[in-house]
Amino acid sequence: MSRLEIALSSTLDHLLKHIFLGTVFLTSLYALYRWLLPKPLPGIPFNQKSAQSIWGDVVELRDDPSGLAKWCSKQLENHGSPICQALMGPLSKPVVLVADVGNAREMLMGRSDFDRSAYIIDRFPLFGEFHLNMKTGDNWRQSRNWLKDLLAPQYLHNVAGPAIHSSVLKLIKLWEHKSCVGDSRAFNMVSDLKTLALDVIVAFHFGSDFQDSALDRQVDHVGKLDGSKLPCGEHNEVEFSKAPLHEFQQALTDVGDKMAAIYTTKWPPLIVAWWVRYVSPYYRPFFQAKDRFIRKHINLAVRRYRNDEEPSTGIDYMVYREEKAARKAYRQPMFDKQIMIDEAYGNLIAGQHTTSAALVWILKLLADYPSVQEKLREELQGIFVGAMQENRLPTAAEIITSKLPYLDAVLEETLRLRAAMLVPRDATKDTELLGRRIPKGTVVLLVCQGPDYKPSPPSKYWSDVKASRVYPGKGNPDLEVFDPERWLVRNEKGDLEFDGSSYPQLAFGLGIRSCWGRRLAMVEMRIMTTLMTLKFELKDVPEGLRGHEASYDISYRAKKGFLRLKSLGEVP
């Protein structure tokens, strides 16, 4: 063989080798691409275009300015189906979206094949061993058992009710000061309602053991302000400075805000939470101090129990419950365990944020719908005629025990429109939902305001769902409109009654994993709405301060929470 032939043969060998290696590389790259592509669940609609991208629906979701809840509703609308799936990128399982809440709720109630979702648990690592962050099991049942007495009518009526009433009266005083100092101009109510919820939840747990009222501090602070020197915003709203809080209350507020930020962060929540808890020079000291603070109050409760004193605080009832459970199980009480500290701490955080968000929506909607506000005021004046004649506001007991159908309808309608937008659940085993197979470990998101909320549903399926959605009252057929009448009926005697049982309400979740604090929240909303409606006329605010844009984290929170008040005196 000549040198030329040898050279050509060698070159050809090298070329074939490179072609082979290139083919292997490209084939491997393609195989990797195929392996990274989302794996849709069979039989459930999905976006075909997203299935050809390793990022699935993530890019579209990230770039959608309307947020997760609205994006989920749009997917269901586009597919014309009660169920579809979102493809969440490489190595992630699809998330199943369900919007026919009427049917899905009945399927999920009482079923053991759906549980608290890791989707939520993974986003709230700062809660620690709080029951909200647990799968259903022995630890969860133990933690929930500690709270049973706090939901009893005796505690809600005799302890929580008066504490809420007292705090709302302080808020009324604060807002009277703000309205006077600010010359009846609009101001932001969000911080004040968070302060109200903070005072209530702290009083609920610690009672007279903690005397420092955040609202008292704000009242004293605003009372010293000079209205002529207050800054104004773009729409002539008054901007009030805030008084410093007790360090424990300030930390509760700040940590709650940080949890909300972690919920929506693009960074891994566990990494952010680790930095906050163990590295941050601002937050790290609080996590050390809050354990000592709560443990001190647990020890006070233990001392009262061993002195045979009657329980008077939320912590007392938790301690007494644990003592009884320990005796029954022949074990030592868990007073010094982290799980008990985290249970108290978690309730303080969650109770403050979720309730305050709902209170903002109630007042915004009443201001936006003056006819509803006036009708509510007429009901309250008629029911509390004795208080009106005595030139006073009704007591907590009067508000809690009175039959107030229109007030109940206002609260129910607010929760229908402006509470939970998404309810996540995890499939604990292979199961079915709406006739589709759901594998174990799949995240299911119940979309509370689906395409059937639109005035003109986008498909026959959603038209049929809308037609089957029966409310007790006649109400506005447009489900995006605030109309309490949809919850009201006439009984056999012709009297107006509230009926909240005819259609599912997911504001507080569902099943055994529903929100334990629902009764407390409803008492707080009832008292606050009653007193504010009797004390103030809620006026409209400038156009630039209106709007119902919201963010979704621990709760569904209004981005604009402005209020303009006209005092009605001691009584209207």
Swiss-Prot record:
Top-level enzyme category: oxidoreductase
Pfam family, one: p450
EC number(s) from the headed UniProt entry: 1.-.-.-
Cofactor: heme
Pathway: Secondary metabolite biosynthesis
GO MF annotations, alphabetized: heme binding; iron ion binding; monooxygenase activity; oxidoreductase activity, acting on paired donors, with incorporation or reduction of molecular oxygen
Keywords from the UniProt entry: Heme, Iron, Metal-binding, Monooxygenase, Oxidoreductase
One example of a Gene Ontology biological process annotation: mycotoxin biosynthetic process
SUPFAM superfamilies: Cytochrome P450
Residues that hold heme according to the record: 515
Similarity section: Belongs to the cytochrome P450 family.
Role according to the record: Cytochrome P450 monooxygenase; part of the gene cluster that mediates the biosynthesis of the 6-methyl-2-pyrone derivative xylariolide D. XilC hydroxylates the 5-alkyl-6-methyl-2-pyrone backbone called prexylariolide D, produced by the highly reducing polyketide synthase xilA, on its side chain to form xylariolide D.
UniProt protein name: Cytochrome P450 monooxygenase xilC
Organism: Penicillium crustosum (Blue mold fungus)
This protein's encoding gene: xilC
